[in-house]
Amino acid sequence: GYGVANEGDVWDIYSRKKEAEACLPVGAVLTIAAAGSEMSWSSVITNEDGWIKRGYSNDLGRCRFAVMNPELTYTLPIYQTKCGAVDILMYFNTETDFEVTDRIAEGLMVSVIHNTRILMKEPENYNARASLMWASSLSHNNLTGCGLSSDWATHQLEHEVSGMFDVAHGAGLAAVWGSWARYVYEE
């Protein structure tokens, strides 16, 4: 919606050369539980001239509606389902402690892992698909980061990978997370 509602090249917004002044109202029809875009203020695009992938966050870009029907994800390959689950888990990345928020995040992570395991055996399990879809939405609407600082380094690192290569975002996150976690462990 930013490219339609703002003068100039939309890439100027994503590369931080200017702020968006408006956004064409957008909606979402979920076909994969992953990034939580349906309840997020963030969006990501890839500039194919240089293969650079960047995100932009602004409340103007929030979806005005979302269709969330778990049945639309039944035919999703299990690989993509697992990539989506990894993506969801990577949004629980606060750097500071706050017990209530941490417990909400913990419950969502347990649910994501539990329901992903169910879907590996039963891809058309409505409740597992619905739970994964709802966890995706809640993971990226700032419920689990409200008032806390977050570390988005893994996403920034992965954007460099999937900007240049045909890699699913969740697979790229899974590849970089372990090294990043070891690097920041003592901080």
What residues fall within each predicted segment?
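Carboxylate- and glycine-rich phosphate/diphosphate-binding segment that chelates Mg2+/Mn2+
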Residues: S42-S149
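Feature representing long, continuous alpha-helical segments
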Residues: H140-N141, H155, H159, A175
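Gly/Pro-rich interdomain helix-loop hinge
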Residues: V161-E187
